């Protein structure tokens, strides 16, 4: 792809997300989603292959369906309220349709099936955009309309997402699919707290983007997409392998790493709101995620003895300079837990 065209597409993606975040008019919000979707599809197909074409087609069909449901919700709301203001969503049917459209765009259960397939079919750079930046626009709209969202529906979807994000990753060895199921589980945690404390949901989003970006940067730097190839990086870059495994454990929420912070704060906030069963179930289901992350870390670091015979490796490692943001991102992704009291105070 021409670098100039790629820059224009990235600018359009950011512009579409910015329109959704700053708009108070329903039509402009829908327009921002459409701009974002049409610009990200060529980015997904940047490295042309049948697999990337299939992934882009699945993404287009899912997002187009969600946009259609979103427009239907907007029209129904307009019929009953006569206003285009975003915060005015009093109709039950419109609220349910809007919630369905947004969780479909986010990839929450039971509309999660496209996330692992699309992520596995695209390059690491495209997967980074798909699992980080593309979550901002739907979550920003949910943040604006959270008082009118059906609480029970959102909590059921969040629990399903945490459960499926854990179960789905148990038998995976492909890192992109592991990151996709991790995304589904993290979205479930964000939705669970959205009703009670939307600011905490935004903090969770920030930490999730931080950890996911760190992991993808490490994978891009090491040119690896599977656990086997990641474990073989011991021969070339042992520091990269160690940092990758640390970020994986942080994504699983293992204390004392950064990933434990949002889970700690969310469980504390739910308990303050006299909710005991929900955080208990969420904590139990989160053990599924932690289990497969620890199993992957164990198999990669302790059971595969490093070999010095580099001729056995199908190595695509490129001697490029470490990205300038990589080390600060990794540090924040693993060692930011002591900042938790500060975030609790600000919250």
Curated annotation (Swiss-Prot):
Transmembrane segments: 1-21, 25-45, 60-80, 96-116, 127-147, 149-169, 178-198, 202-222, 239-259, 274-294, 326-346
Keyword field contains Transmembrane: yes
Membrane topology, from the record: Multi-pass membrane protein
Domain of life: Eukaryota
Compartments where located: Mitochondrion inner membrane
Main location as per UniProt: mitochondrion
Function: Core subunit of the mitochondrial membrane respiratory chain NADH dehydrogenase (Complex I) that is believed to belong to the minimal assembly required for catalysis. Complex I functions in the transfer of electrons from NADH to the respiratory chain. The immediate electron acceptor for the enzyme is believed to be ubiquinone.
GO BP term (any one): mitochondrial electron transport, NADH to ubiquinone
Single GO MF descriptor: NADH dehydrogenase (ubiquinone) activity
PANTHER family the UniProt entry points to: NADH-UBIQUINONE OXIDOREDUCTASE CHAIN 2
Family: Belongs to the complex I subunit 2 family.
Entry's Gene Ontology cellular component terms: mitochondrial inner membrane
Protein name: NADH-ubiquinone oxidoreductase chain 2
InterPro entries: Complex_I_Subunit_2 (IPR050175), NADH_DH_su2_C (IPR010933), NADH_UbQ_OxRdtase_chain2 (IPR003917), ND/Mrp_TM (IPR001750)
Assembly information from the UniProt record: Core subunit of respiratory chain NADH dehydrogenase (Complex I) which is composed of 45 different subunits. Interacts with TMEM242.
Coiled-coil intervals, chain numbering: none
The entry's keywords: Electron transport, Membrane, Mitochondrion, Mitochondrion inner membrane, NAD, Respiratory chain, Translocase, Transmembrane, Transmembrane helix, Transport, Ubiquinone
Gene name tied to this protein: MT-ND2
Enzymatic class: translocase
Catalytic reaction annotation: a ubiquinone + NADH + 5 H(+)(in) = a ubiquinol + NAD(+) + 4 H(+)(out)
Annotated EC: 7.1.1.2
